[in-house]
Amino acid sequence: VLPFSAALEVLGYWVLGRIFCDIWAAVDVLCCTASILSLCAISIDRYIGVRYSLQYPTLVTRRKAILALLGVWVLSTVISIGPLLGWKEPAPNDDKECGVTEEPFYALFSSLGSFYIPLAVILVMYCRVYIVAKRTTKNLEAGVMKEMSNSKELTLRIHSKNFHEDTLSSTKAKGHNPRSSIAVKLFKFSREKKAAKTLGIVVGMFILCWLPFFIALPLGSLFSTLKPPDAVFKVVFWLGYFNSCLNPIIYPCSSKEFKRAFVRILGCQCRGRRRRRRRRRLGGCAYTYRPWTRGGSLERSQSRKDSLDDSGSCLSGSQRTLPSASPSPGYLGRAAPPPVELCAVPEWKAPGALLSLPAPQPPGRRGRRDSGPLFTFRLLAERGSPAAGDGACRPAPDAANGQPGFKTNMPLAPGQF
């Protein structure tokens, strides 16, 4: 729509014929109405998010969101299709003239359906959001939490609307923690409140940009004496277009989530891809460890899907503590040995005696080869002395005898190595 409107303003006349002029005018009303109704739907969504923050995922489902989007476009089509069906003023004799339909009753109908009714819904929803946010903030700030150490009871007191006290008590045996519950509620409410503030800015700019046009259009159509000059009408007409340029600026500046979404949509991820490739080159090798197999050993993993660089369980250039592997029943009751330090070097192979010793089998399972649990992890190569400037990875010397050793934080069962 916008390129054709710009061509009309620059050239001063319409060059695409009468039929395309009618289509352009209808599509212009369709897109503007869909934009305004979308803000109306978002305001309802924000009210639900603030009023029912904990129940929001169950109230607003994917299916309901799709139905809301379909409703927005169906209503927009109903409002905009009138001129294509003949509900318009007589066409001028000159095909080089083209503009929005100024038929009085259609102008009134489209103004009510496209702007004034959605605006009333938006204002009502935001008044409700403000009331709920103010009341909820006051109640959460006035809430008093106590912990009785002797009886191990947790008491949460929240002053509600009629200033009565609701006491919620639970014991540790039940595993319910009111403090964690109120923390979740505070987090969700603050997030929804911030989103509502962002949308409030958007709605404010929407009113400032569209209100002059929807005042000038119906008044100029119904009363010829109140029709504004062409220059004024063009200014208010393009002011409505300008609102669509503001929204992509307001959303990222007010919300990190929207900013990340815009960056992802625009495809500005080249820098992130380069960083990930650099981490893969410098981060060592991916290995697979099968702890309870007969002859359990460390194997070089060939699948990128098993690499912890993609799953976020390993950071390049630093060490991450790996979770301890649970021992088999055959090892229960034995004292856990100190962690063995391992280091994997791409060009250096560890002696086979260290990596291929058979692991003891749990009772009743001898003679069987059970794959057991699979642990995939990344052993980051340690650099040697500072003088080694070639970037090669060398084994770290063992603290006891100066021999090359390995380094990891995962404790191994006795007799595994």
Swiss-Prot record:
PROSITE patterns: G_PROTEIN_RECEP_F1_1, G_PROTEIN_RECEP_F1_2. It is found in: Nucleus membrane; Cell membrane; Cytoplasm; Membrane, Caveola. The keyword Phosphoprotein applies. The keyword Phosphoprotein applies. GO terms for biological process: adenylate cyclase-activating adrenergic receptor signaling pathway; cell-cell signaling; phospholipase C-activating G protein-coupled receptor signaling pathway; positive regulation of cytosolic calcium ion concentration; positive regulation of MAPK cascade; regulation of cardiac muscle contraction; regulation of vasoconstriction. Residues 45-64, 128-198, 255-417 are cytoplasmic. A lipid is attached at residue 268 (S-palmitoyl cysteine). Keywords: Cell membrane, Cytoplasm, Disulfide bond, G-protein coupled receptor, Lipoprotein, Membrane, Nucleus, Palmitate, Phosphoprotein, Receptor, Transducer, Transmembrane, Transmembrane helix. Residues 9-20, 88-104, 223-229 are extracellular. It is a multi-pass membrane protein. One of its GO terms (cellular component) is nucleus. This alpha-adrenergic receptor mediates its action by association with G proteins that activate a phosphatidylinositol-calcium second messenger system. Its effect is mediated by G(q) and G(11) proteins. Nuclear ADRA1A-ADRA1B heterooligomers regulate phenylephrine (PE)-stimulated ERK signaling in cardiac myocytes. This is Alpha-1B adrenergic receptor. It comes from Canis lupus familiaris (Dog). The gene is ADRA1B.
